[in-house]
Amino acid sequence: MTRCEFFTENDRINGFSISGHSDFDEPGKDIVCAAISAVVTMAEATINDVCGAKDKVRVKDGENNRITLTLPASCDEEDSVQAVLTGMMLTLCSLRDDYPDNIEVLEV
């Protein structure tokens, strides 16, 4: 199962951590994993390249692949960044509703 954690405080999303594999199908054929990857990649690229927010991204490869993004305490494009992260969370929640055995979404 893929675990999607959103770090929130005072109605602000401070970052996220996505780990694991959805196990919907074998790697390379897993549409749930592909959808999650596309959503995460879009959010990370938008925050970095379009919004110009200076964030910290760590990617760890291995059996429990993980990507973690942590925002600074404030950024110039705060409203845009929060809109991107909220859209990401809503999209992942929609996937969770369709594939509850393969993805979980948590606010921590």
Regions found by a protein language model. Give the residues of each.
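N-terminal intrinsically disordered, cationic/polar leader segments
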Residues: M1-I31, T41, A45-V108
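Short, conserved glycine- and acidic-residue-centered signature motifs
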Residues: V32-I36
